[in-house]
Amino acid sequence: MKNVRLISHPLIEHKLAILRDKNTQPFQFRMLVDEISHLMIFEATRDLNLREISVQTPVATTKARKLATKVMICPILRAALGMLDSVFTIIPDASVGFLGFQRNEKTAQAEFFYAKLPKDAKSRLAIIIDPMFATGGTAIDAVKFLRENSVKQIKFISIIAAPEGLRRFSEIYPDVEVYTAAIDERLNEKNYIVPGLGDAGDRVFNTL
């Protein structure tokens, strides 16, 4: 899977260990999701385009570079809202395009229910964020929706992923890079990631 980027860093691994722990409290879980996302966004944005500008410092005029790429952050509701602030902190001029998917517990499939994109979405790099990448179904549907709305540049950031979902996604969208901090063992019979960390949305919003 050439499009999958596993981000390995001692700080991320340390925070992941606490994030996975079932005894980690919701307030700490939210903080860890935010911090891990903060660290991951650096790697995912490594190839953004820059433009040269002239800056007047207190001492002299110098050349500098600023972002030329316009970014649209696309959190998948609701769990990804826990990742949004950290990305905004790094890219404050980004726009947000909301994508709403809800898991159907009977079918274990994600059902689309809401979308709100900025008017200039098609001219932006879309960075989809979702803490869990399980079957790949939500990711596939999210990319399909963006492509149908003329968004050409897309990346995906997920904290934990399952190999089954990554393989399925990569077969359909080999051109979309996926950044993850961990590739776990497998999916269980309910399509939950093993060992995983449970339901990220419930743990972020304390609705267990």
Swiss-Prot record:
InterPro entries: PRibTrfase_dom (IPR000836), PRTase-like (IPR029057), Upp_B (IPR034332), UPRTase/APRTase (IPR050054), Ura_phspho_trans (IPR005765). Gene3D superfamilies: 3.40.50.2020. One of its GO terms (molecular function) is magnesium ion binding. It comes from the Bacteria. Its EC number is 2.4.2.9. Binds 1 Mg(2+) ion per subunit. The magnesium is bound as Mg-PRPP. Pathway: Pyrimidine metabolism; UMP biosynthesis via salvage pathway; UMP from uracil: step 1/1. 5-phospho-alpha-D-ribose 1-diphosphate binds at residues 78, 103, 130-138, 199. Allosterically activated by GTP. GO terms for biological process: UMP salvage; uracil salvage. Pfam families: UPRTase. SUPFAM superfamilies: PRTase-like (SSF53271). Uracil binds at residues 193, 198-200. Keywords: Allosteric enzyme, Glycosyltransferase, GTP-binding, Magnesium, Nucleotide-binding, Transferase. It catalyses: UMP + diphosphate = 5-phospho-alpha-D-ribose 1-diphosphate + uracil. The keyword Magnesium applies. It is an enzyme of class 2 (transferase). Its cofactor is Mg(2+). NCBIfam families: PRK00129.1 (NF001097), upp (TIGR01091). Belongs to the UPRTase family. Catalyzes the conversion of uracil and 5-phospho-alpha-D-ribose 1-diphosphate (PRPP) to UMP and diphosphate. This is Uracil phosphoribosyltransferase.
